[in-house]
Amino acid sequence: METLSRYMIYLENEKYLPDDANSILSISRNVLREYHIIIRDVRVASYFLELDMSISPFDLEKVKSKLTQVGSVIEIDRIVEIELDKKISLNLARQLFNNEKFWKTHEVLEGVWKHTQGDERSLLNGIILVAAALVHYQKGEHAICISIMKRALDKLHGSSGLYYDVDVDVLKTNVKNIVNSTEISKFEI
């Protein structure tokens, strides 16, 4: 049996909303039914659809071609774990977050989080939870998103000011607004 590699495949989003994630997942699985693949999730961002897949590298071009039935492929990112310098990781996580790549934000920040302790660890856990909450929003899981945002607020409670280039006070305000209104909106960190 072939070894599968994990990829994030990004398709252009011309019309979909987060509530469409399950139907896009079904369509994608149907379009790719003849291939030995795993499609874990579909997440819907403003400008792209993010398909979390495991594929044989040998089938990648065929899968890419088939996925044009769902949307134009704009990026393919093979997922590999790498250790980065803390400052580089935090900068990358911020860029990913601001580009609505919340799953990858979560992954990059976890790499930093596991090497921290105390207040910094709690702060990073809060930011990771915000990213995780927004992953659920992109899957159309609004109630789960709000629930995780509440947990994030608990972790962020004791923090303020700037953490590298992240304004923690602005982050907390955005999260509080979402929790209080239960209206999920895009924001940057």
Question: How should these model regions be labeled?
Answer:
Residues 85, 118, 122-125:
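Residues that mark the junctions of alpha-helical repeat units in TPR/alpha-solenoid scaffolds
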Residues 117-120, 158-162:
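Short coil/turn linkers that connect adjacent helices within long alpha-helical scaffolds
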